[in-house]
Design a protein with these regions (language model features):
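Bacterial N-terminal signal peptides that target proteins for export
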Residues: 1-9
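Bacterial N-terminal signal peptides
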Residues: 9-18
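N-terminal module-boundary/linker segments of secreted carbohydrate-active enzymes
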Residues: 24-159, 392-433
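Signals and flexible motifs at protein termini associated with secretion
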Residues: 39-51, 55-56, 60, 65-66, ...
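Low-complexity, serine/threonine/proline-enriched polar segments
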Residues: 136-230
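Active-site-proximal segment of zinc-dependent metalloprotease catalytic domains
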Residues: 234-330, 334-336
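Metalloprotease/metallohydrolase-associated module, dominated by Zn2+-dependent proteases
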Residues: 277-313, 317, 334-433
Length: 433
Protein backbone atom coordinates (compact mmCIF):
# COMPACT_ATOMS: atom_id res chain seq x y z
CA UNK A 1 0.00 0.00 0.00
CA UNK A 2 1.18 3.51 -0.78
CA UNK A 3 1.14 6.53 1.47
CA UNK A 4 0.97 9.97 -0.03
CA UNK A 5 2.10 13.40 1.02
CA UNK A 6 -0.36 15.81 -0.54
CA UNK A 7 0.78 19.30 -1.48
CA UNK A 8 -1.21 22.17 -2.90
CA UNK A 9 0.11 25.44 -4.30
CA UNK A 10 -0.87 28.66 -2.62
CA UNK A 11 0.34 31.96 -4.00
CA UNK A 12 2.82 33.43 -6.43
CA UNK A 13 5.78 35.35 -5.07
CA UNK A 14 7.96 37.90 -6.74
CA UNK A 15 11.22 38.55 -4.92
CA UNK A 16 13.40 35.76 -6.26
CA UNK A 17 11.91 35.48 -9.72
CA UNK A 18 12.06 39.20 -10.36
CA UNK A 19 15.74 39.29 -9.52
CA UNK A 20 16.86 36.01 -11.06
CA UNK A 21 18.89 36.60 -14.21
CA UNK A 22 19.00 34.24 -17.17
CA UNK A 23 22.67 33.92 -16.25
CA UNK A 24 24.61 35.89 -13.68
CA UNK A 25 25.84 39.19 -15.03
CA UNK A 26 23.57 39.06 -18.08
CA UNK A 27 20.50 41.12 -18.80
CA UNK A 28 17.25 39.26 -18.34
CA UNK A 29 15.80 38.70 -21.83
CA UNK A 30 12.30 37.49 -20.93
CA UNK A 31 9.85 37.45 -18.09
CA UNK A 32 10.65 34.81 -15.50
CA UNK A 33 7.79 32.89 -13.79
CA UNK A 34 7.16 33.30 -10.10
CA UNK A 35 7.84 30.96 -7.23
CA UNK A 36 4.95 29.41 -5.32
CA UNK A 37 4.54 28.63 -1.63
CA UNK A 38 3.23 25.17 -0.85
CA UNK A 39 2.28 23.39 2.38
CA UNK A 40 1.78 19.67 2.73
CA UNK A 41 0.23 16.87 4.73
CA UNK A 42 1.33 13.24 4.99
CA UNK A 43 -1.70 11.40 6.31
CA UNK A 44 -1.96 7.96 7.82
CA UNK A 45 -3.79 5.25 5.89
CA UNK A 46 -7.57 5.63 6.00
CA UNK A 47 -8.03 2.40 7.93
CA UNK A 48 -5.44 3.47 10.51
CA UNK A 49 -7.18 6.79 10.99
CA UNK A 50 -10.51 5.04 11.51
CA UNK A 51 -8.98 2.67 14.04
CA UNK A 52 -7.59 5.60 16.05
CA UNK A 53 -10.97 7.35 16.06
CA UNK A 54 -12.74 4.20 17.22
CA UNK A 55 -10.23 3.56 20.02
CA UNK A 56 -10.36 7.14 21.30
CA UNK A 57 -14.16 7.14 21.18
CA UNK A 58 -14.35 3.87 23.12
CA UNK A 59 -11.48 4.24 25.58
CA UNK A 60 -10.47 7.90 25.57
CA UNK A 61 -7.06 6.97 24.15
CA UNK A 62 -5.51 4.98 21.32
CA UNK A 63 -2.82 2.31 21.38
CA UNK A 64 -1.83 3.51 17.92
CA UNK A 65 -0.97 7.00 19.18
CA UNK A 66 0.33 8.30 22.48
CA UNK A 67 -1.03 11.80 21.87
CA UNK A 68 -3.81 13.26 24.05
CA UNK A 69 -6.83 13.16 21.74
CA UNK A 70 -10.58 13.66 21.76
CA UNK A 71 -13.14 12.64 19.17
CA UNK A 72 -15.84 14.85 17.71
CA UNK A 73 -18.93 14.08 15.67
CA UNK A 74 -20.78 16.84 13.86
CA UNK A 75 -23.73 17.04 11.50
CA UNK A 76 -22.65 19.56 8.88
CA UNK A 77 -25.28 21.98 7.64
CA UNK A 78 -23.15 22.51 4.55
CA UNK A 79 -24.12 19.11 3.15
CA UNK A 80 -26.27 17.41 5.79
CA UNK A 81 -23.70 14.67 6.35
CA UNK A 82 -22.16 13.50 9.62
CA UNK A 83 -18.41 13.73 10.20
CA UNK A 84 -16.15 12.26 12.87
CA UNK A 85 -12.53 13.10 13.61
CA UNK A 86 -9.89 13.46 16.31
CA UNK A 87 -8.20 16.60 17.64
CA UNK A 88 -5.29 17.03 20.05
CA UNK A 89 -6.44 18.29 23.44
CA UNK A 90 -9.40 17.94 25.79
CA UNK A 91 -12.98 17.81 24.53
CA UNK A 92 -14.30 21.39 24.78
CA UNK A 93 -17.87 20.09 25.09
CA UNK A 94 -17.19 17.77 28.04
CA UNK A 95 -18.48 18.77 31.45
CA UNK A 96 -15.94 19.14 34.22
CA UNK A 97 -12.58 17.44 34.11
CA UNK A 98 -9.16 18.81 33.26
CA UNK A 99 -9.29 21.07 30.23
CA UNK A 100 -5.54 21.70 30.12
CA UNK A 101 -3.48 19.48 27.81
CA UNK A 102 0.25 19.44 27.12
CA UNK A 103 2.21 17.78 24.34
CA UNK A 104 5.88 17.14 24.97
CA UNK A 105 7.72 18.76 22.06
CA UNK A 106 11.23 18.50 20.67
CA UNK A 107 12.96 21.08 18.49
CA UNK A 108 15.46 19.36 16.21
CA UNK A 109 17.74 21.73 14.27
CA UNK A 110 18.57 20.30 10.84
CA UNK A 111 21.91 21.17 9.26
CA UNK A 112 21.50 20.74 5.51
CA UNK A 113 24.55 20.32 3.28
CA UNK A 114 24.05 20.65 -0.48
CA UNK A 115 26.60 19.68 -3.13
CA UNK A 116 25.75 22.00 -6.05
CA UNK A 117 25.06 25.69 -6.60
CA UNK A 118 22.96 27.43 -9.20
CA UNK A 119 24.86 29.42 -11.80
CA UNK A 120 21.91 30.68 -13.81
CA UNK A 121 18.70 29.77 -15.60
CA UNK A 122 18.54 28.08 -18.98
CA UNK A 123 16.10 28.91 -21.79
CA UNK A 124 13.41 26.83 -20.05
CA UNK A 125 13.92 28.59 -16.70
CA UNK A 126 15.58 25.52 -15.23
CA UNK A 127 18.43 26.08 -12.78
CA UNK A 128 21.86 25.43 -14.25
CA UNK A 129 24.12 23.99 -11.55
CA UNK A 130 27.81 23.45 -10.89
CA UNK A 131 29.62 21.60 -8.08
CA UNK A 132 29.79 23.58 -4.85
CA UNK A 133 29.14 22.90 -1.18
CA UNK A 134 26.79 25.00 0.96
CA UNK A 135 25.96 24.44 4.63
CA UNK A 136 22.67 25.68 6.10
CA UNK A 137 23.20 25.62 9.86
CA UNK A 138 20.46 27.15 12.04
CA UNK A 139 22.71 26.99 15.11
CA UNK A 140 25.24 29.45 13.62
CA UNK A 141 24.88 33.23 13.57
CA UNK A 142 23.75 34.66 10.22
CA UNK A 143 24.83 38.24 9.59
CA UNK A 144 23.62 38.31 5.98
CA UNK A 145 19.87 37.94 6.50
CA UNK A 146 19.73 38.81 10.21
CA UNK A 147 21.26 41.48 12.41
CA UNK A 148 22.72 41.27 15.91
CA UNK A 149 21.59 40.71 18.56
CA UNK A 150 18.89 38.69 16.76
CA UNK A 151 21.22 36.95 14.35
CA UNK A 152 20.99 33.38 15.62
CA UNK A 153 18.23 31.49 13.74
CA UNK A 154 17.78 28.72 16.31
CA UNK A 155 17.42 31.17 19.18
CA UNK A 156 14.83 33.17 17.23
CA UNK A 157 12.96 29.93 16.50
CA UNK A 158 13.01 28.93 20.17
CA UNK A 159 11.80 32.37 21.26
CA UNK A 160 8.84 32.50 18.85
CA UNK A 161 5.19 32.69 20.03
CA UNK A 162 4.75 29.06 18.99
CA UNK A 163 6.93 27.99 21.92
CA UNK A 164 6.96 30.97 24.30
CA UNK A 165 4.14 32.77 26.12
CA UNK A 166 3.01 36.16 24.84
CA UNK A 167 -0.01 38.36 25.51
CA UNK A 168 -2.35 37.41 22.67
CA UNK A 169 -5.77 38.88 21.91
CA UNK A 170 -8.34 37.73 19.36
CA UNK A 171 -10.87 40.33 18.33
CA UNK A 172 -10.02 42.44 21.36
CA UNK A 173 -10.53 39.59 23.82
CA UNK A 174 -7.50 38.63 25.87
CA UNK A 175 -6.59 34.98 25.30
CA UNK A 176 -4.04 35.14 28.07
CA UNK A 177 -0.27 35.03 28.35
CA UNK A 178 0.28 31.95 26.25
CA UNK A 179 1.43 30.32 23.03
CA UNK A 180 -0.20 31.25 19.73
CA UNK A 181 -1.70 27.82 18.99
CA UNK A 182 -3.14 27.59 22.51
CA UNK A 183 -4.76 31.00 21.99
CA UNK A 184 -6.14 29.81 18.67
CA UNK A 185 -7.66 26.64 20.13
CA UNK A 186 -9.34 28.64 22.88
CA UNK A 187 -10.73 31.15 20.38
CA UNK A 188 -11.81 28.38 18.00
CA UNK A 189 -14.07 26.72 20.60
CA UNK A 190 -14.79 29.82 22.69
CA UNK A 191 -18.59 29.54 22.52
CA UNK A 192 -18.45 25.95 23.80
CA UNK A 193 -16.30 26.68 26.83
CA UNK A 194 -17.88 27.39 30.20
CA UNK A 195 -14.57 28.79 31.44
CA UNK A 196 -12.36 29.62 28.43
CA UNK A 197 -9.39 30.53 30.63
CA UNK A 198 -9.17 26.90 31.79
CA UNK A 199 -8.95 25.45 28.28
CA UNK A 200 -5.38 24.98 27.10
CA UNK A 201 -3.49 23.02 24.46
CA UNK A 202 0.20 23.67 25.08
CA UNK A 203 3.48 22.52 23.63
CA UNK A 204 5.18 21.61 26.90
CA UNK A 205 7.76 20.71 27.97
CA UNK A 206 9.91 21.86 25.05
CA UNK A 207 13.43 20.55 24.63
CA UNK A 208 15.96 21.28 21.91
CA UNK A 209 17.94 18.25 20.77
CA UNK A 210 21.38 18.10 19.16
CA UNK A 211 21.43 19.09 15.49
CA UNK A 212 20.89 16.48 12.80
CA UNK A 213 23.11 16.70 9.70
CA UNK A 214 21.63 15.76 6.33
CA UNK A 215 24.07 15.67 3.43
CA UNK A 216 22.02 15.93 0.26
CA UNK A 217 23.17 14.10 -2.89
CA UNK A 218 23.78 16.33 -5.90
CA UNK A 219 20.73 14.93 -7.67
CA UNK A 220 18.46 15.69 -4.71
CA UNK A 221 19.22 19.30 -3.87
CA UNK A 222 20.93 22.52 -4.81
CA UNK A 223 21.54 26.05 -3.54
CA UNK A 224 20.77 29.38 -5.13
CA UNK A 225 23.49 31.85 -4.14
CA UNK A 226 22.64 35.46 -3.19
CA UNK A 227 23.09 36.53 -6.82
CA UNK A 228 19.62 35.13 -7.45
CA UNK A 229 18.17 37.97 -5.41
CA UNK A 230 17.99 36.83 -1.78
CA UNK A 231 20.02 38.21 1.13
CA UNK A 232 21.83 34.89 1.47
CA UNK A 233 21.92 31.37 0.05
CA UNK A 234 18.60 29.63 -0.54
CA UNK A 235 18.49 25.84 -0.39
CA UNK A 236 16.16 23.46 -2.23
CA UNK A 237 15.94 19.76 -1.34
CA UNK A 238 13.92 16.99 -2.97
CA UNK A 239 11.03 16.28 -0.62
CA UNK A 240 10.98 12.55 -1.39
CA UNK A 241 14.63 12.23 -0.40
CA UNK A 242 14.15 14.39 2.69
CA UNK A 243 11.05 12.66 4.03
CA UNK A 244 12.48 9.19 3.42
CA UNK A 245 15.65 10.21 5.26
CA UNK A 246 13.61 11.37 8.25
CA UNK A 247 11.50 8.20 8.23
CA UNK A 248 14.31 5.72 7.75
CA UNK A 249 17.24 7.35 9.54
CA UNK A 250 16.52 10.33 11.75
CA UNK A 251 13.34 9.34 13.59
CA UNK A 252 14.56 5.80 14.43
CA UNK A 253 17.85 7.28 15.72
CA UNK A 254 15.98 9.65 18.05
CA UNK A 255 14.05 6.85 19.76
CA UNK A 256 13.17 6.20 22.54
CA UNK A 257 13.39 9.85 23.60
CA UNK A 258 11.27 10.86 20.63
CA UNK A 259 8.21 8.62 20.57
CA UNK A 260 4.54 8.45 19.62
CA UNK A 261 3.53 10.41 22.71
CA UNK A 262 5.41 13.54 21.71
CA UNK A 263 5.91 15.88 18.76
CA UNK A 264 9.30 16.48 17.09
CA UNK A 265 9.62 19.64 15.00
CA UNK A 266 12.50 19.70 12.52
CA UNK A 267 13.82 23.21 12.00
CA UNK A 268 15.12 24.02 8.52
CA UNK A 269 16.80 27.35 7.89
CA UNK A 270 16.39 29.12 4.53
CA UNK A 271 15.89 25.70 2.98
CA UNK A 272 12.71 24.61 1.25
CA UNK A 273 11.54 21.35 -0.25
CA UNK A 274 10.56 20.60 -3.82
CA UNK A 275 9.88 17.85 -6.30
CA UNK A 276 12.26 16.29 -8.75
CA UNK A 277 13.65 17.69 -10.86
CA UNK A 278 14.33 20.32 -8.22
CA UNK A 279 16.07 22.42 -10.88
CA UNK A 280 12.60 23.10 -12.34
CA UNK A 281 12.18 25.65 -9.58
CA UNK A 282 9.18 27.56 -10.91
CA UNK A 283 7.11 24.38 -11.23
CA UNK A 284 8.38 22.06 -8.48
CA UNK A 285 9.20 24.49 -5.64
CA UNK A 286 8.57 25.46 -2.82
CA UNK A 287 7.20 23.41 0.11
CA UNK A 288 8.00 25.41 3.24
CA UNK A 289 6.75 22.81 5.68
CA UNK A 290 4.46 19.89 6.31
CA UNK A 291 3.06 17.78 9.11
CA UNK A 292 3.32 14.05 8.71
CA UNK A 293 3.00 10.65 10.30
CA UNK A 294 5.04 7.48 10.05
CA UNK A 295 3.57 4.17 8.92
CA UNK A 296 4.72 2.57 12.18
CA UNK A 297 2.57 1.26 15.02
CA UNK A 298 2.34 3.32 17.15
CA UNK A 299 2.22 6.33 14.84
CA UNK A 300 4.89 9.02 15.14
CA UNK A 301 3.67 12.51 14.26
CA UNK A 302 6.31 15.05 13.20
CA UNK A 303 6.73 18.28 11.28
CA UNK A 304 9.56 19.91 9.33
CA UNK A 305 9.30 23.69 9.06
CA UNK A 306 11.46 26.26 7.32
CA UNK A 307 12.39 29.39 9.26
CA UNK A 308 12.89 31.70 6.31
CA UNK A 309 14.76 34.99 6.56
CA UNK A 310 15.77 35.37 2.89
CA UNK A 311 12.82 37.62 2.03
CA UNK A 312 12.16 35.50 -1.05
CA UNK A 313 8.58 34.90 0.03
CA UNK A 314 7.81 38.48 0.95
CA UNK A 315 8.22 40.43 4.18
CA UNK A 316 5.27 38.81 5.99
CA UNK A 317 5.65 35.17 4.94
CA UNK A 318 8.92 34.38 6.69
CA UNK A 319 10.13 33.40 10.17
CA UNK A 320 7.31 31.70 12.19
CA UNK A 321 4.61 31.88 9.53
CA UNK A 322 5.11 28.32 8.30
CA UNK A 323 5.60 27.00 11.83
CA UNK A 324 2.25 28.45 12.95
CA UNK A 325 0.53 26.82 9.95
CA UNK A 326 1.97 23.36 10.56
CA UNK A 327 1.60 23.21 14.35
CA UNK A 328 -2.03 24.35 14.17
CA UNK A 329 -2.75 21.65 11.61
CA UNK A 330 -1.00 19.02 13.72
CA UNK A 331 -3.34 19.92 16.60
CA UNK A 332 -6.56 20.07 14.57
CA UNK A 333 -5.86 17.31 12.06
CA UNK A 334 -3.11 15.23 13.68
CA UNK A 335 -3.32 12.32 11.24
CA UNK A 336 -4.14 14.37 8.16
CA UNK A 337 -7.53 12.85 7.41
CA UNK A 338 -10.22 14.45 9.57
CA UNK A 339 -12.98 14.56 6.93
CA UNK A 340 -14.95 17.69 6.02
CA UNK A 341 -17.36 18.67 3.28
CA UNK A 342 -15.33 19.65 0.23
CA UNK A 343 -14.12 23.24 0.09
CA UNK A 344 -11.81 25.05 -2.29
CA UNK A 345 -10.92 28.05 -4.39
CA UNK A 346 -9.45 29.81 -1.37
CA UNK A 347 -6.06 30.07 0.33
CA UNK A 348 -3.73 27.49 -1.12
CA UNK A 349 -6.48 25.59 -2.95
CA UNK A 350 -6.77 27.09 -6.44
CA UNK A 351 -10.07 27.83 -8.18
CA UNK A 352 -11.61 24.68 -9.62
CA UNK A 353 -9.87 22.46 -7.07
CA UNK A 354 -11.23 21.05 -3.82
CA UNK A 355 -9.94 19.75 -0.50
CA UNK A 356 -11.87 17.84 2.17
CA UNK A 357 -9.88 17.69 5.41
CA UNK A 358 -9.60 19.81 8.55
CA UNK A 359 -6.39 21.60 7.60
CA UNK A 360 -6.93 24.90 9.42
CA UNK A 361 -3.97 26.63 7.78
CA UNK A 362 -4.66 25.82 4.14
CA UNK A 363 -7.74 28.04 3.55
CA UNK A 364 -5.80 31.10 4.74
CA UNK A 365 -2.31 30.42 3.43
CA UNK A 366 -0.86 33.81 2.56
CA UNK A 367 -3.07 35.67 5.09
CA UNK A 368 -1.60 36.68 8.42
CA UNK A 369 -2.64 37.14 12.03
CA UNK A 370 -1.44 40.33 13.71
CA UNK A 371 2.37 40.30 14.04
CA UNK A 372 3.76 39.85 17.53
CA UNK A 373 6.73 41.81 18.79
CA UNK A 374 9.07 39.49 20.62
CA UNK A 375 10.69 40.34 23.90
CA UNK A 376 13.95 39.97 21.99
CA UNK A 377 12.99 42.87 19.69
CA UNK A 378 12.26 40.60 16.72
CA UNK A 379 8.87 40.83 14.99
CA UNK A 380 7.25 37.43 14.47
CA UNK A 381 4.81 36.77 11.64
CA UNK A 382 2.03 34.25 12.24
CA UNK A 383 -0.56 32.93 9.84
CA UNK A 384 -4.27 33.54 10.35
CA UNK A 385 -6.09 30.23 10.84
CA UNK A 386 -9.59 28.96 10.01
CA UNK A 387 -11.89 27.91 12.83
CA UNK A 388 -13.46 24.45 13.07
CA UNK A 389 -16.89 25.87 12.20
CA UNK A 390 -15.71 27.28 8.88
CA UNK A 391 -15.39 23.74 7.57
CA UNK A 392 -18.70 22.39 8.88
CA UNK A 393 -21.34 24.83 10.03
CA UNK A 394 -22.95 28.23 9.61
CA UNK A 395 -23.25 28.36 13.42
CA UNK A 396 -19.82 29.31 14.70
CA UNK A 397 -18.36 27.89 17.89
CA UNK A 398 -15.65 30.55 17.68
CA UNK A 399 -15.16 33.78 19.54
CA UNK A 400 -17.47 36.62 18.36
CA UNK A 401 -19.14 33.96 16.16
CA UNK A 402 -16.13 34.36 13.86
CA UNK A 403 -14.89 31.76 11.41
CA UNK A 404 -11.16 32.59 11.61
CA UNK A 405 -8.95 34.16 14.24
CA UNK A 406 -8.50 37.51 12.50
CA UNK A 407 -12.06 37.69 11.09
CA UNK A 408 -11.08 37.29 7.44
CA UNK A 409 -13.75 34.60 7.14
CA UNK A 410 -17.15 36.04 8.05
CA UNK A 411 -19.16 32.94 7.03
CA UNK A 412 -18.53 29.23 6.69
CA UNK A 413 -16.98 27.69 3.57
CA UNK A 414 -20.30 27.85 1.74
CA UNK A 415 -21.69 25.38 -0.79
CA UNK A 416 -19.84 22.10 -1.17
CA UNK A 417 -16.96 22.50 -3.59
CA UNK A 418 -17.30 20.78 -6.96
CA UNK A 419 -14.00 20.39 -8.81
CA UNK A 420 -13.75 21.70 -12.33
CA UNK A 421 -13.72 18.94 -14.91
CA UNK A 422 -10.18 19.81 -15.92
CA UNK A 423 -8.90 20.31 -12.37
CA UNK A 424 -6.02 17.95 -11.94
CA UNK A 425 -2.43 18.25 -10.88
CA UNK A 426 -3.31 20.29 -7.81
CA UNK A 427 -1.92 17.55 -5.63
CA UNK A 428 1.62 16.26 -5.63
CA UNK A 429 2.10 12.82 -4.06
CA UNK A 430 5.14 11.60 -2.20
CA UNK A 431 4.90 7.84 -2.38
CA UNK A 432 6.45 5.57 0.23
CA UNK A 433 6.19 1.79 0.30
Amino acid sequence: MDRKLIVMAVCALAALSAAAPAAFGQEQKKAVPKLHIMHATKAVKAETGEAVKNEVAAMGASKKSGLPLFTYTIQSDRDGQQYTGVIVGADPTAKGGNKSTSVSTFIVPVIVVTQTVGTGLDANNMIVTAPGKTVFDPTKNDNSCLAAPNNNPLQLFQQSPIFQNYDISVGGVDMGHTQYIDAFQRAEFYNLLKNPDNYQVLLSPIKTLSPVVITVPAASGTTLPPEFGACGPFGIVDIDFFDAFLDNNVLPALQPQVNAGNFPIFMLYNTVLGFNPITDIFVNCCVLGYHGNTATNPIQAYSPSDFDTTGVFGPTQGDSNTLSHEVAEFVNDPFGNNPTPAWGGVGQVPPGSCQNNLEVGDPLSGTNFSPIGGRNGFTYHLQELAFFSWFYSSNSTGIHDWFSDNDTFTTDAGPVCVPAAAASGNTRPIVHP
